[in-house]
Design a protein with these regions (language model features):
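Short helix-coil-helix linker/hinge
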Residues: 49-56
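Peripheral terminal and linker regions in Fe-S/redox and tRNA-modifying enzymes
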Residues: 66-69, 83, 87, 104-106
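Long, compositionally biased, glycine/small-hydrophobic-enriched stretches that function as flexible linkers
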Residues: 1-11, 17, 53, 61, ...
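A short, conserved structural fragment
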Residues: 92-103
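Long, low-complexity, charged/polar intrinsically disordered regions in eukaryotic proteins
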Residues: 1-44
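Short, amphipathic alpha-helical interaction segments positioned at domain boundaries
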Residues: 106-129
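Short acidic, hydrophobic short linear motifs in intrinsically disordered regions
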Residues: 58, 64-77
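Short amphipathic alpha-helical interaction segments
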Residues: 77-93
């Protein structure tokens, strides 16, 4: 029964086996230890299709249900704000991150939510993907 959730790839498909993308999948799923996702799990595969290494590394700094500003994430990463903002917007457009404006502070905020419910559905339902 466990194999039923593993992906079966066509012969022509080349998995990137990107550890950072896999780490992001596990971050979104709050998975640690023996229960982590693998490269064959759908949670990894759907991210690999549209998330590059830079996006994944920035995505690891997203709070799960916790809003963070570009400035906060850039400071955590010791990276330029414009670079971090670009990656966060790409994550939001792909469906991994959520993006809104904190009207009290008049600043953009970003966050992630767990796979259940919805993150995979947001990615799949995006006309851009």
């Amino acid at each position: 029964m466990q194999d039923i959730t593993k992906m079966i790839f066509p012969d022509w498909y080349q998995c990137r086996y990107d550890q950072d993308v896999l780490a992001l999948a596990n971050h979104l799923g709050r998975k640690k230890g023996k229960e982590t996702f693998t490269f064959e799990d759908p949670e990894y595969v759907i991210l690999e299709a549209g998330v590059d290494k830079d996006m994944a590394i920035v995505g690891l700094h997203l709070g799960i249900y916790v809003e963070k500003t570009v400035e906060e994430i850039a400071k955590e990463m010791n990276q330029p704000e414009d670079y971090v903002e670009e990656q966060l917007k790409k994550l939001a457009f792909y469906g991994v991150a959520f993006w809104n404006t904190d009207k009290k502070r008049n600043v953009d905020v970003f966050w992630a939510e767990t796979w259940i419910p919805g993150t995979m559905e947001v990615i799949v339902n995006s006309q851009e993907n």
